Amino acid sequence: MNSQNLALISMILEDRLSEQGKILALQQCQNLNDSIMPSFSAINFKSPVAGLLWHLFLGFFGGGRFYKGDIMQGVLYIVAFVLVCVCASYDEDLFNLAFLLYIVVYGVDFYLIYKGIQKDNFQKFQNFLLFQNFSQQQKSEATKAF
């Protein structure tokens, strides 16, 4: 792959992958041919920063988890929020404990959402490479058959 396409891939992956993932991805791209660029741009990478913003503004309702694609965990956030609100009407001490636990999970989830989106993006990239290698093998086998 030529250096212009590698630079373009590097720009696309800039904030989408961790540093180690980006280095590994660029090393793997060096062996590919330039014809994959149109299909590479079709990969729907999610932004970890957008996930953090969703979590910051709608995190109490599972916004960051829904953005990441963890629907069940987003639903659990909604259920937990409702339970914390119900605890508020019964007992103040129970509410304080439930709210403290909810805030701790909410805070830890900032890190987990950010790293999880980067990991999901890397997995999408690996699946893309696997598909590209498979389709190249199929083409070469079809060419050999003729």
Which residues are covered by each model-predicted region?
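A short amphipathic helical element positioned immediately N-terminal to and/or at the very start
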Residues: L53-Y67
